[in-house]
C-alpha cells in the first residue's frame, strides 16, 4: 500500500501567517498512529494560539507508512526542518514512542525553541529519560496529563506565556 499525499503538506514551505505565532506539532507517524484522534484535538486547540505548521500530522489520510512527497524522505526532512526553524513554539505528544519525534525535539533544543512535551503515564509506557531529563521547567517542559484534560493544559500553557512575548523577569531591574 502506497503512502498518501496528505492535505496540509504543500509545495510551499512558507506556512506562517503574519502576526500569528508559528506552532510546530510533533506526533508519531511511522512509529504508530494509535493517537491520531488525540492529535486532531491537539491541533484543533493549537489553532487558537497560532498557525500550526504541521497540522498534517493529525490527518486521517496519513497512515503509519507516512506520506508521499515528490522528493521523498529527504524533502520531508528538509521541509520539516524549515518549519521547525520558523516555529515560535514546539508542542509534542510523546506518549507513542517515535524516533522522528525524538529527532525533532533534539533539533528544536539545538534551535533554542520553546518546547512543551505532553505524556500520558496511564498509557503504561515510560517516557524516555532523554526527554524527561531534558526538562528545565522553562524553555523545555514535560507535562504528564490525562487525555480528557489536554485542551485545558494547552490553554494554561499558552495563556500563561503567549508566544512572541518576553517572559517577565522576576527581577524588576532587568
Swiss-Prot record:
The gene is DNPH1. It comes from the Eukaryota. Expressed at low levels in brain, colon, lung, peripheral blood leukocytes, placenta, small intestine, and thymus. Expressed at high levels in heart, kidney, liver, skeletal muscle and spleen. Overexpressed in a significant proportion of breast cancers. Inhibited by AMP and GMP. It comes from Homo sapiens. Belongs to the 2'-deoxynucleoside 5'-phosphate N-hydrolase 1 family. Induction: Expression is induced by ETV1. The modification Phosphoserine is found at residues 28, 98, 123, 128, 138, 169. This is 5-hydroxymethyl-dUMP N-hydrolase. It is found in: Cytoplasm; Nucleus. InterPro entries: 2'-dNMP_N-hydrolase, DNPH1, Nucleoside_deoxyribTrfase.
